[in-house]
Design a protein with these regions (language model features):
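Structural motif
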Residues: 54-57, 90, 104-108, 128, ...
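Hydrophobic alpha-helical
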Residues: 107-110, 173-249
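N-terminal helix-turn-helix DNA-binding module of bacterial transcription factors
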Residues: 1-44
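An alpha-beta-alpha
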Residues: 147-182
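Alpha-helical recognition/docking segments in bacterial nutrient-uptake
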Residues: 57-145
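Hydrophobic alpha-helical segments within soluble ligand-binding/sensing domains
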Residues: 136-161, 222-244
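Short beta-strand segments enriched in small/hydrophobic residues
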Residues: 6, 43-60, 157-163
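Hydrophobic structural packing positions in well-ordered secondary structure
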Residues: 5, 25, 51, 74, ...
Length: 249
């Protein structure tokens, strides 16, 4: 029946369908090269499967490269989770009707609230501290990074090297965690790079000083962090009540 085909296409598990029938329908779907219409699915589920990303346009080429690396990685990750990514810079703070959830990347607190005031979709802050129990915020665990660096270098003397950071509380937390910090704005600043031990979380910096003999690279957006982002997207889009909205990875 039409209903049976619909159940199989939409992966309904609450209906009793024999394996033989399911396999036959899937074979025919494959032969016809059928893919479900996204608009039709949205009408049924009330979800667009679109995630919007708001980010502050980078000033330096290094930051632009790092943003692009993150966006590419996030796009591929969300695609594997059946989500699509929409990217917007800070110049486009407006109502976004299409998105199930809005992510922000390293934006200032005041800009975060501007985005929130313009939208009804749930907001999730990445790499910034909003400290508002209404919103999820997902950040790196700098104390954990410090412990990993001490274990790796075998001593407490090392320098945390990073691209410039917009969020003030995140910068303050880094300042209180690491005794030696170097922010890199341009490639030229790496010409006289002579630090003994270096901890890096930015992909572009890891590539630029890839031959540096005493370096520890721990991605600021690990697979674990992406999974936490996805979990927060699911919780937020489904309006599931969670006690802890402050996630550190």
């Amino acid at each position: 029946s039409v209903a049976t085909v619909s159940y199989i296409i939409n992966n309904r598990e609450d209906q009793k369908i024999s394996p033989e029938t399911r396999n036959k329908v899937l074979q025919i779907i494959n032969l016809l090269d059928y893919t479900p219409n996204q608009a039709a699915k949205s009408l049924v589920t009330q979800k667009s499967q679109i995630v919007a990303l708001h980010y502050k346009e980078a000033e330096s080429y290094l930051q632009k490269a790092e943003q692009l690396h993150f966006i590419n990685k996030l796009t591929n990750f969300l695609h594997n989770k059946n989500y699509y990514l929409m990217c917007l810079s800070e110049h486009y703070i407006e109502k976004i009707d299409l998105a199930d959830v809005i992510l922000t990347l390293d934006v200032a607190k005041e800009d975060f609230y501007k985005i929130g005031n313009a939208n009804f979709s749930p907001l999730i802050a990445l790499d910034s501290f909003i400290d508002d129990p209404v919103f999820f915020q997902i950040n790196s665990d700098f104390q954990k990074l410090k412990k990993q660096a001490i274990q790796y270098f075998g001593e407490t003397t090392f320098t945390f090297v990073s691209l410039p950071i917009n969020d003030e509380k995140r910068k303050e937390l880094i300042q209180n965690t690491f005794s030696s910090i170097k922010y890199v704005k341009s490639v030229e600043e790496l010409d006289n790079f002579d630090y003994k031990n270096v901890l890096i979380i930015d992909s572009i910096l890891e590539q630029l000083i890839s031959n540096y003999y005493n370096k520890l690279y721990i991605s600021g957006f690990s697979d674990e962090k992406f999974e936490k982002i996805f979990q927060a997207i699911e919780w937020a889009s489904q309006r599931i009540e969670i006690n802890n909205h402050n996630i550190v990875v």
